[in-house]
Amino acid sequence: VDSISNGWAHIMDNSSGSGRYCSAAYLTRVRDYVSGDEDNDPIQPPRTSHIDGVMTVIIDPGHGGSDVGANNGGSLDEKHVNLYVAQYLKQYLEAAGAKVIMVRDTLEEGSELTLRGAVMKQYASSADLFFSIHHNAANTTARGAEILAQIADKNGGPTKILAQALLDEYEKLGVPIRQIVFREGSHGDYYYTNRAAAALNIPALTSEFCFIDNEEDQKFIDSDEDWQKQARAQRNAILYYFTQVQY
């Protein structure tokens, strides 16, 4: 362990020079590290069911049911695009060996925020990531991708790593890049899914791939091929993420 910040420990592999993040809550002998007592035994590896060698991802296709989300001013509702991309992402991640849990798998379900929290609690002991898929809307002029990450990672940590990897992948598709957002509310993370996941020690973020109400951005989401491209970009970023963190 070479550093601990915001509850996350960065663990270096001296043989390769690379490192990974792990929740400091999973480490023993953290006090010895912090005190710099080199005479003590090294920190022992984490012992928890959460770290089991299986990439476990909860995918949340945002909105659903009566909550359609944003709209392009015509027939394209956000809840549809979110689900279609999520279904492809599930397929791609499972092909890579991940275990995937879907918050919803139909257009009719998923309008309640509490459903997200219930799924998180059900899989809290094994989930390595809560990944929420959304598409933005504003005033028809705004465009581009942004990621809503957990505030604990503002200065570095798992969701910031994944957020940057996502933006890098989206940029390859030609999507304008906006920013990584760390928004704080009165009770922690401003965004519900980030806040609820943080309470369960699950890294979580929301991908806002582009603006569904912007004419230029719509070209990135108006076909099945586009949904597959977005899902592949997300898969690439998530698989990279899992090379940087323990799971």
Give the location of each predicted region.
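Sec-exported extracytoplasmic/periplasmic mature domains
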Residues: D32, Q87-K99, K121-S125, H135, ...
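Active-site-adjacent mobile loop/cap segments within catalytic or ligand-binding domains
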Residues: S132, N136-N139, L148, V181-Y247
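Conserved beta-strand/loop element in small beta-rich adapter and peptidoglycan-binding domains
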Residues: V1-S5
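Boundary regions of SH3-family modules and the immediately adjacent low-complexity/disordered segments
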Residues: D13-R47
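Active-site-adjacent substrate-binding region
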Residues: P158-S186
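Hydrophobic anchor at the start of a short beta-strand
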Residues: V100-I101, I177-R178, A204
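Catalytic-core regions of hydrolytic enzymes
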Residues: G36-L162
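Short aromatic-glycine-enriched beta-strand elements
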Residues: N6-H10
